[in-house]
Amino acid sequence: WIMGHMVNAIAQIDEFVNLGANSIETDVSFDDSANPEYTYHGVPCDCGRTCTKWEYFNEFLKGLRKATTPGDSKYHEKLVLVVFDLKTSSLYDNQASDAGKKLAKSLLQNYWNNGNNGGRAYIVLSIPNLAHYKLIAGFKETLTSEGHPELMDKVGYDFSGNDEIGDVAKTYKKAGVTGHVWQSDGITNCLLRGLDRVRKAVANRDSSNGYINKVYYWTVDKRATTRDALDAGVDGIMTNYPDVIAGVLNESAYKAKFRIASYDDNPWETFKN
């Protein structure tokens, strides 16, 4: 999965997919009442990027729905996965469940079109703080009470705080999550970060009793770092330059081993060689 980083304006969906992304990451900020409000990152952000592009969250969802609904004039067949980077650090811990409920309502109405031919992309809820694990239950309860528990088949999870792998595993246990797990590792492109924790995550993914289904690394803008991440065995790379990642995947060393994921590749299944 080539994951376009910080895609917060509707116009950027086309831009990143046209550069080679089959997945995008979108920031979601919340108001004081835990309503998802804007797709907005803010300052500071990655080097070389404009930090302040934004939409109202529900409007972004409508644009995203068009981009992922077959038959729509804006449809992109290859856009198959969306990571919502949930900026919950502005909330109190006890608001996490409410944030999940309100997020589910927004997605149900504006993205899934109340279960009637909505967008088809798989969705990852990426949570920065382990203490906010109740967001997941709130989200699930709402889809169930609104009569659409089947949409949970399209939803996965990520804790993005670079926490100890063991602590993340314990948190999923508390949250009652037993699958659909992506594990992120990374740092802003302005700084360097080694691949030690990525390798631990990959080892967990490939063990018989691990909790991880997929591992992604962020934010990668250079060819050399891309090669290092692929050599470590990641499933996804988040980038400001999808064309750079696509270029490396085309190199003979990687062409035989990796391919770009399509809609038929289940993002919740651990890939077995």
UniProtKB/Swiss-Prot annotation:
GO BP term (any one): lipid catabolic process
Residue positions of the active site: 5, 41
Catalytic activity field: an N-(acyl)-sphingosylphosphocholine = an N-(acyl)-sphingosyl-1,3-cyclic phosphate + choline; an N-(acyl)-sphingosylphosphoethanolamine = an N-(acyl)-sphingosyl-1,3-cyclic phosphate + ethanolamine; a 1-acyl-sn-glycero-3-phosphocholine = a 1-acyl-sn-glycero-2,3-cyclic phosphate + choline; a 1-acyl-sn-glycero-3-phosphoethanolamine = a 1-acyl-sn-glycero-2,3-cyclic phosphate + ethanolamine
Key words of the record: Cytolysis, Dermonecrotic toxin, Disulfide bond, Glycoprotein, Hemolysis, Lipid degradation, Lipid metabolism, Lyase, Magnesium, Metal-binding, Secreted, Toxin
Cofactor: Mg(2+)
Subcellular locations according to the entry: Secreted
Keyword hit for Cell wall biogenesis/degradation: no
Protein name, UniProt field: Dermonecrotic toxin LdSicTox-alphaIB1avi
Organism of derivation: Loxosceles deserta
Lineage, broadest ranks: Eukaryota, Metazoa, Ecdysozoa, Arthropoda, Chelicerata
